[in-house]
Amino acid sequence: MLKTSIPSQGIQQNPLVCQLANSIEAVWQRYLNLEPYYLPADLGYVEGRLEGEKLIIQNKCYQTAQFRKLHLELATIGPKLDILHCVMFPRISYPLPIFGTDLVGARGQISAAVVDISPQSQDRKLPEVYNYQLQALPIKEFAHPRQLPQWGEIFSEFCLFIRPTGLEEEQKFISIVESYLEIHCQQAIAQKPVSPEQQLEILKAQHHYCTQQRQNDKTRRVLEKAFGPEWTDYYLTTVLFDSPN
């Protein structure tokens, strides 16, 4: 099994961001047989400047029998902004939804926290086994829920998008992310490959998911200011939300 650790070089982040990164990798290690996923050499660790501040992006990616790419990104912009981004892209031969989570920290406070397992079926619903387990989690027990963006129709009814207030809510969010991850990994390793016809439907669904995610204007604006539009398109389509072949 591949041994992993994150964060590393050049990344000094909000403690909650570091805690979540370590939690994600711990669950992956517990359930999945991780193998390297090779990014282009210039995209594993990236530095730039944004409004006078140093911007650092560090990417780690893995693959498994069930997932074509597990992506964990950490980013910092000077002392102002800390970001964690994670998506688990299934192989099109497995009928799995897509797990994703993000944390955004600004000046020591977490301003946004989101986690979801997004359906990939034609009826835009999660498999019943997911519904049964997710509905038991305390996702309604947060003081400051946030509104999903217009392109957020890709998310499930169990999407949790909040601004956590205080240590208790922050730790509750971490616990919920771990539960989502464990449910998803358990279901993944129990799945069997589907027919070629079903693979075509999964391929279409992943294309749609990636296309919608690339509409996140906030992400694009930050990257374009630091690296320009051409590099931003390259990064969005190669690292963040690359569609399967």
Curated annotation (Swiss-Prot):
Q: What is this protein called?
A: Phycocyanobilin:ferredoxin oxidoreductase
GO MF: cobalt ion binding; phycocyanobilin:ferredoxin oxidoreductase activity
| GO annotation, biological process | phytochromobilin biosynthetic process
What Gene3D superfamilies does UniProt report for this protein, alphabetically? 3.40.1500.20
What species does this protein belong to? Trichodesmium erythraeum (strain IMS101)
Taxonomic lineage is: Bacteria, Bacillati, Cyanobacteriota, Cyanophyceae, Oscillatoriophycideae
**Catalytic activity annotation:** (2R,3Z)-phycocyanobilin + 4 oxidized [2Fe-2S]-[ferredoxin] = biliverdin IXalpha + 4 reduced [2Fe-2S]-[ferredoxin] + 4 H(+)
Family per UniProt?
Belongs to the HY2 family.
List its EC numbers: 1.3.7.5
Purpose of the protein: Catalyzes the four-electron reduction of biliverdin IX-alpha (2-electron reduction at both the A and D rings); the reaction proceeds via an isolatable 2-electron intermediate, 181,182-dihydrobiliverdin.
Q: Which UniProt keywords apply?
A: Oxidoreductase
